[in-house]
Amino acid sequence: MQYLCQRCHSLINFKDVYDDDLLKLKNLPKSRFVQASSLTEMNESGESDDQMNSSSEDYPAQRLQLYKKTISEGDYNFDNVPPPELRTPTLDSFVVLPAAKDGYEEEKNSPEEVNDLFSWKIEIYNRIFDLLSSKTKVDHPLCVECAELLTEEMSKTLRALKEEKKMYFNYDNFLSSQTVHEENTAALDSEIDELMKQINEKEEKIEEISDETDKLQKLLRELDEEKEKVYAEEQEFYNNLNQFQIKKLSLERQYDCANLEFEHNSRKLEKLQKMNVFSDIFYISHYSEPNGEGSIATINGLRLGRLPSQKVNWAEINAAWGMTVLLLDVLTEKLDFHSSSYQLKPFGSQSFIIRFDRDPNGNQVKPTKLDLFSSGELKIFMNRRFDQGMVAFLDYLHQFGDFCAAKTPSAVLPYAIENDRIGGKCIRLAFNQDENWTRALKFVLTDIKFLEAYVSSQDKQSNF
């Protein structure tokens, strides 16, 4: 028969007892149960102890007294003892049937007795282990090593309890040996009264402190509420500040963009202000002959005039006259100049000028159309109209120059104009050399270029 130790879970081997002896012991509890029940009945019937002693001659008197005391104080009931069986099997335990020993005579006991014997052994062990487990804080069964360790621990506990008992006993003796005198009692009473007075004062002070604590707690709650309110206001302030910062950054970006755009436009405006629109549209220059025999004035690349060494066709000359008329008309319109004697009509290569004549009475007669172009034919009438047109154009230019000089005295034409001459050169084509006529036309374009610069400067000043 083997069990497991409830502490280390190792196997526990029990020494087998001879079955004959167990059979003898098996009958012993039954006789004791009978005697116990008989003792109980005798107590209930009022029999004396002597009678009980006489009926229990098998037991010593001292053991019988202990047994009776145990029965009377305990809650044991032996009337309904069940037959031996495994009622409370031990956990983690098992039974191993031992092999037959040498020399054991199986024929002495019947199989029923052998089975009953093993059941009874299991029941006895289980009862013992249950009893030990209920009386101690340790589950049973235990192996030898665990039992020794438990014994040592319980011995240490016992020694500690004995020491504690001894200490209490000595202290009790010390208190018992102290004698209290009446003076000491009076002094102690006075001291007790003083202590009670101090206790009362402390209690009053505690109440005052408690009241002050309540006030402080109330003030603390108010401060907490104020803190929450301030925190909420702070959060709102920072939210507004963040929104303001975002808006500020957006406005700063817009401001930077506007500044960049303004700087760009300012540079562009400055560039445009420095730019002479008239000179860009009507570019006036001159064309020099390779052999150095003279130069011809040009407007937008069109030659205005001709030289003996280079015969310029009249289509180019007429186109150059058309550009010249258009430029002078734009300049006069820009300064709001109006002549009472002439009116320019720019029509490209067929441009002309209208002259308004008056009779001796000052009345205006029919306007005269004067051409500023020529076909190149040697017809006196055609050249006469062309010459009159160029003289009228020169007079119109002279009037416009005087108009500009009246506004700005320093604005004097580079080449003076007098009747049909400019810079001392006649502008008529008839009875004139090509070199002189071409030079007169060059002086005309030079004066117009001067007026062009003047009008451009006046335009810039008006813009500012």
Curated annotation (Swiss-Prot):
Domain of life: Eukaryota
BARA as annotated region, ranges: 275-461
Compartments in which it is found: Endosome membrane; Vacuole membrane; Preautophagosomal structure membrane; Cytoplasm
Pfam families according to UniProt: APG6, APG6_N
A biological process term (GO) from this entry: mitophagy
GO MF term (any one): phosphatidylinositol 3-kinase binding
Coiled coil: 144-274
Cellular-component GO terms for this entry: cytoplasm; endosome; endosome membrane; phagophore assembly site; phagophore assembly site membrane; phosphatidylinositol 3-kinase complex, class III, type I; phosphatidylinositol 3-kinase complex, class III, type II; vacuolar membrane
Keywords: Autophagy, Coiled coil, Cytoplasm, Endosome, Membrane, Phosphoprotein, Protein transport, Transport, Vacuole
InterPro entries with a match to the protein in the record: Atg6/Beclin, Atg6/Beclin_C_sf, Atg6/beclin_CC, Atg6_BARA
Subunit structure: Component of the autophagy-specific vps34 PI3-kinase complex I composed of vps15, atg6, pik3/vps34, atg14 and atg38. Also a component of the vps34 PI3-kinase complex II composed of atg6, pik3, vps15 and vps38.
Chain's role: Functions as a part of the autophagy-specific VPS34 PI3-kinase complex I that plays a role in autophagosome assembly. This complex is essential to recruit the atg8-phosphatidylinositol conjugate and the atg12-atg5 conjugate to the pre-autophagosomal structure. Also functions as part of the VPS34 PI3-kinase complex II.
Name recorded for this polypeptide: Vacuolar protein sorting-associated protein atg6
Organism field: Schizosaccharomyces pombe (strain 972 / ATCC 24843)
